[in-house]
Amino acid sequence: MRRWVVRSAGLAVVVALVGIVYGCGGGGGVLTIDRIGKEDAPNTMTLQLNNSYTHQAATPSWADGFERLFTQFAEDHPDWKMELKIIPDDQTTQEQARLLEAARVGRAPDCANVDSFVVPQFIEQGALKPVDQYFTEEEKQDLFPFVSDVVTGDDGKMYAAWWATDLRVLYRRTDLVPEAPRTWDELIEYANAAEQKDSKVDGYLYNGGRWEGTTFDNLAHFWSQGGELVDEEGQPVFGEEPNRTYMLNELNFLKETVDSGASPQRVATIKNYDEFEAAAQAGTVAMFQGGDFQYPPLKESLPPEEFKKWEISFIPTMNPDDPQKTGTGGWTMGAFSDDPEKVKMCMEFTKDVFIGEGNQVTGQLPTSESLFDELPKFKEPIYDTFREGLKEGEARPGVPVYPEISNQIQIAIGTVLTGESTPEEALDEAYKNSLSAYEEQQK
């Protein structure tokens, strides 16, 4: 429970306030640490949520927002109570594997947060229940293409409600880089020119260290060429033509960013988006590849006259006519229960709390085009850019071998950036190890 601080007040006041909002036992309260709805409600559903998407969120505005939404939902559905299991934010990734196993043995919660990345695995296992009937055709058609692709099974049915997403973009200081680079060559040229204008800045920063962001962010360079990581069976194919050439092009481009001086070699150690924000605040970077989610904190942390210098554009590509792909992630809600009433309630909760309202609370991007028009949070012109970028969104392949593919690509990028391996050597090693992992999984 979040601590309530009431200055110049006695303990009784604090207890009273907590009692009003969270309940003090019995059936009176509609919201507690682990329950939404009255304790004596006749119908019960188990609900598993990430901590960030609850009234226990670390961000105060998020906690307050979800407290309001949970309370309203409980009041609107007096016959239902949700027994909450809250997953700590630093365990959400690991929890997906546990959730998949729980579903396999019939012990999954009735309703839960499911990472968009692993939804295809849940569908393939038969863990998720179809939810088509709770969404109109118009609502389903309004989803961005990458969203529909992920949540739709081979049978054409919709199996999860993907409600929040993000994307990767290029941030640049317009006093140093007046025009947005369209190609890799222009990116390197403009980065070097910026360093000539101001010797204190790095021309271009990006994730190059050992973490998922390095693979995911830079896959845009691979996808924009038409690259595929795996085939329809989930087997790695990024080392086979034409994908091999596309991946070599990506690795050679990243190598050139360092070799040319456009990027410092220390990009091989960057594994946190916060480094880009810190560099922007210090005035030591001209361009960086980051996420849409960095726009609000940059706006808040930079003086207005400095923030005005920054603009956002799409990720440059190898050729000027290549589509400007971008990696997209985010969270869904899935229904696991065999009880149709609980599946229905799961989707009612999702639509009342997360779709639209949850985007308003968190600022995370909607997955439906129309919500960009409807929600006040996204009226600022920059969200038109994000909305347009999502049309070229790409989700990671939701196959069991992807984590090892990502790990191997991280290693490959790192060894190329530091000069330990040539792009060819790094790719061959990454592909060999990814295939071995896939073959081991097939046993």
Task: Locate the predicted segments by residue.
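Long, aromatic- and glycine/proline-rich binding clefts that accommodate carbohydrate-like moieties
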Residues: 151, 310-315, 361-411, 415, ...
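Glycine-centered hinge/linker elements that transmit conformational signals in sensory
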Residues: 190-191, 235-268
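Short, solvent-exposed loop/beta-turn-alpha elements that line the ligand-binding surface or hinge
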Residues: 133-143, 204-211, 225-249, 300-305, ...
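A structural signal for short loop-to-beta-strand junctions that line the ligand-binding cleft
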Residues: 109-110, 139-175, 321-325, 392-399
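Extracytoplasmic/periplasmic solute-binding protein
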Residues: 157-164, 168, 188-239, 243, ...
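Hinge/lid segment of periplasmic solute-binding proteins
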Residues: 32, 116-167, 185-190, 198, ...
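Extracytoplasmic/periplasmic substrate-recognition and gating elements
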Residues: 178, 256, 260-263, 300-365, ...
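Conserved N-terminal structural module of periplasmic/extracytoplasmic solute-binding proteins
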Residues: 2-10, 21-120, 425, 429, ...
